[in-house]
């Protein structure tokens, strides 16, 4: 088994009302429950971002569209990708990038 990073991209962002936010959180909670012991770290959504450049300068925003992350444990990349198929961000117009991590 190995760890894989789910990088969430896009989606419609934060819900506009407390009721809608509660519904979104319930959807994520339900999906996390289906992952069971494979869920290593539920992660966090991303907020503000700055990019640091090689010359030391920085700019606001990342430009990548990443909106959050989670970490799962799976047998291989294919199994991790299968786990990502139920992610709520997919139904919201977003995508999940699945990255294998390397133990160092």
Question: Language-model segments: which ranges?
Answer:
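Conserved, structured core segments of small domains
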Residues: 1-104
């Amino acid at each position: 088994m190995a760890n894989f990073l789910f990088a969430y991209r896009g989606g419609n962002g934060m819900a506009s009302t407390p009721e809608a936010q509660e519904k979104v959180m319930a959807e994520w909670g339900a999906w996390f429950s289906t992952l069971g012991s494979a869920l290593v770290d539920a992660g966090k959504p991303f907020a503000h971002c700055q990019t640091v450049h090689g010359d030391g300068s920085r700019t606001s925003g990342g430009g990548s569209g990443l909106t959050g992350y989670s970490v799962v444990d799976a047998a291989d990349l294919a199994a991790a990708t299968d786990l990502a198929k139920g992610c709520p961000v997919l139904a919201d117009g977003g995508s999940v990038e699945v990255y294998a991590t390397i133990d160092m």
